[in-house]
Structure formats: C-alpha cells, structure tokens
Amino acid sequence: HFIETTKQSNARKRNSLSMEKQITIEEIQNFEGKYPKQLWYLFTVEMWERFCFYGMRGVLTFFMVDQLLLKDDAANLQYGAIQAFVYAFTFIGGIFADKILGFKKSLFFGGIVMILGNLLIAFAPQQMFYYGIAFSIIGTGFFKPNISSMVGELYHEKDPRRDAGYGMFYAGINIGGLLGGALCIYLGKYHSWTLCFLAAAIVMVAGLITFLLTKKHLGPIGDSPLLAMPESKRKIREIAVYVGSLLSIPFIYTMVINTDYTDYFMYTIGIVAIGYFVFELLKLGEISLQKKLIAAFSFIFFYFLFNAIYEQSGGSLSLFAKDNLNSNLLGFTIDPNVVNNSSNTFFVIVL
C-alpha cells in the first residue's frame, strides 16, 4: 500500500510538472472573465513594492532634516537627486531586462537589492543612510519597469480587457502607496527609524516570496530574451549585469552626496536616452510602428513633467507640512506628513 501510494504521489508530481511546462502565452491570454489570475499575483507583488517605495519616499526629506541635521534646502536638493537617479535607473534597468535578463530575473534581482538597502539603513540609520539609498536606487531601477511590462503581456494586443487589468493593477499601486506612506512616517517619528526601514524591508520580502511562489503561472512571460543563446554565454552576460550594477553603488553614493554632480549625470543620461530612442525608432523600419513609438515617447515625456511636479510632495511639500500644517483635525490628531504622503493615493482609491 505504501509503495502504491508513493507511485501515485510521484505520478501526480510528474503530471504537475508537465502541466507547468505546458503553459503557454496563448493559454494565459485566453482566460475567461475580466481578469487573468496572474494579474492578482502581480497586483500583490507590486502592492508590497510600492509600500516600500512610497514609505521610503515619504520619510527621506524629513529623516535628512531630523536625523542627519541637514538644512531644508540641502535636504530638498538631495531628495531631488535621489528621485532623479531612481527615474534614470528605471530606464537603464528596463534596457538590461529587455536585452539580457528578462523581466523575471530583473524583478527578482531588483527586489533583493532593495531589501539589502532597507536593511542597511534599518540597522544603522545615520551611518548607512546614503549607502542604503544607493542600493534602493539600483533595486527600484530593475524592479519597477518590468512588473508593469509583464501585466501588458497577460493580454492579447487588442484585448479590450487590458485597460481594466491595468486599472486594477494601479489600484494595487495606490493601496501600497497609501499604507506605506502613512505607516513608515508614523513608525519613524513616533517609534524608531530602525523600525520604519525594517518595515519597508519586510514587505519587500513578502512581495518577493509571493513572486517566487507564483511565477510558474506566468509561463514564458518575462523569460530571458537570450534563451536561444548557449547557457554559458548567457550566464556571463547576466553576471556582468549584476556585478556592474553593484559596482555602480559607490558612484551613485558620490552623486547623491554631491548634488552638483547629479546635474551632469542627468544631462548625460538624457542625451543617451534620446539617442537610444532614435536608434530604436530607425531600427523598426515600418512607419506604422514608428508612429506608435513616437506616440509612446510623447506620453513618457509628459509623464516625466508630471512627476517633476508630483515628486515635490516628498521634498518641499514634506518640509512645508512639517513646519506649517496643524496636526489637529476635527478633534483628531493626524500627523501632517501622514496626510501629505497618503492623501493622493487615498483619493485615487476613493474616486
């Protein structure tokens, strides 16, 4: 009886593995209902990552003024440099994912680096702050652009349900932003900064565990674009990306500390980004595809303009809230920076 049970168990395992191997992009995209099940997995992963990101973003300027004893204008400049590097490295991380790593490996690597960055700050907030920030910049650059790309691949190109899928996905972003923006500043100001940054690390661990447990359901979505290449050559390229990214951490640390250098880097990355866009545009050949890419670039341009204004909420508006807002509202005590960090995401969810 024991032998027979073992055989049946092994057979079930083989069948399960076989089913996992057989899942195709067509099977994923031909789902019934409004949302594919894979969307909920990515929703959860992104929710925890945005908790981490918006939690960190909401405390940066306040922490630099309160704990590192920087003046308001110096803290605001360094916050701007940090955010500039975050957006610059999403461009770089997206290229590496698209050309070498694939979305899955890029996302996992980015998550690990973000966790390390938060842990560095958690265990030595004053001493390791800028090193931890450098890790977080690299991690966000590899994580953020790639999970959104995987959501798009859950649908056929002309599937009318794609908009609803992205709407639900961005609801997860706002839920994570609401929770992280409120909880991290509360933990830091009223309990300990170690607990604040540790909470950000813990939720990222939860997000990565969710991803590891569910990535098999994504099938070929997010796999390396170099699967046809011999494994040894592919591994060399992947390791080069990992090592090169980590070796850039002292460079980022120096740029964030010395904000004058940041401008030169941003001018350089801006020229490189435009050059890369022109290169990809000419490579397409077909006019219809070129028009789509130009349209996408237009949206990206206005997205950057929007974020240049929106990110003031983590910098100058954070300082304004700290110094000018009343913490009493209708008899309730609410920290001004909890309101500043979370009001946008709250109203997006409500509306």
What do the predicted segments below correspond to?
Residues I112-F129:
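C-terminal ends and interior cores of transmembrane alpha-helices
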Residues M128-F143:
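Hydrophobic core of transmembrane alpha-helices in multi-pass small-molecule transporters
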Residues D163-G181, G188, V203:
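Glycine-rich segments within core transmembrane alpha-helices of 12-TM secondary carriers
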Residues F142-H156:
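Intracellular juxtamembrane helix-capping segments at the cytosolic ends
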Residues G58-N76, G315-N337:
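Short amphipathic helix-loop junctions that connect adjacent transmembrane helices
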Residues G80-A97, S342, F346-L351:
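Central cavity-lining transmembrane alpha-helices of secondary-active solute carriers
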Residues N15, M19-K37, E157, I185-S318, ...:
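Intracellular loop-helix junctions on the cytosolic face of multi-pass helical membrane proteins
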